């Protein structure tokens, strides 16, 4: 919005749409700290999907004027990052990698659950970088 590439009316329309999109995302996040998927989203423990959601929430954060929504998005991204950090590969040559599924370490999962793909890494890294920018702006980094 800072580049003024759209009219004020178009900005308002885009802002309203972005804020509207946040509601279904936020309402599906697992916020129970006792749940092993705390920070993920209901029915979806695919890390690429969570990374994409994180990218979207960060983008909404930057375009909304609502301080209340910014606080909610910040909390959501914080626990989303917590979940993602738990699911990263911790050791070996793939340390730091992000597999297809958060269930990659559980017995009996499909063989492709542990596959590390570039889109998993790209979406999560992009979401993390945007969140780092928010932490920097808010002085919480």
PLM regions with names:
Residues 1-141:
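Glycan-recognition and catalytic cores of secretory/periplasmic carbohydrate-active enzymes
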């Amino acid at each position: 919005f800072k580049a003024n590439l759209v009219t004020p009316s178009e900005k308002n329309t885009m802002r309203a749409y972005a804020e509207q999109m946040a509601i279904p995302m936020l309402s599906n996040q697992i916020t129970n700290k006792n749940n092993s998927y705390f920070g993920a989203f209901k029915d979806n423990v695919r890390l690429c999907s969570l990374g994409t959601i994180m990218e979207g929430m960060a983008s909404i954060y930057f375009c909304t004027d609502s301080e209340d929504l910014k606080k909610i998005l910040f909390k959501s991204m914080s626990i989303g990052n917590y979940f993602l950090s738990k699911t990263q590969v911790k050791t070996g040559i793939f340390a730091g990698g992000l597999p297809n599924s958060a269930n990659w370490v559980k017995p009996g999962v499909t063989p492709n659950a542990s596959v590390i793909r570039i889109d998993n890494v790209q979406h999560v890294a992009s979401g993390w970088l945007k969140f780092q920018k928010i932490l920097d702006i808010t002085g919480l980094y």
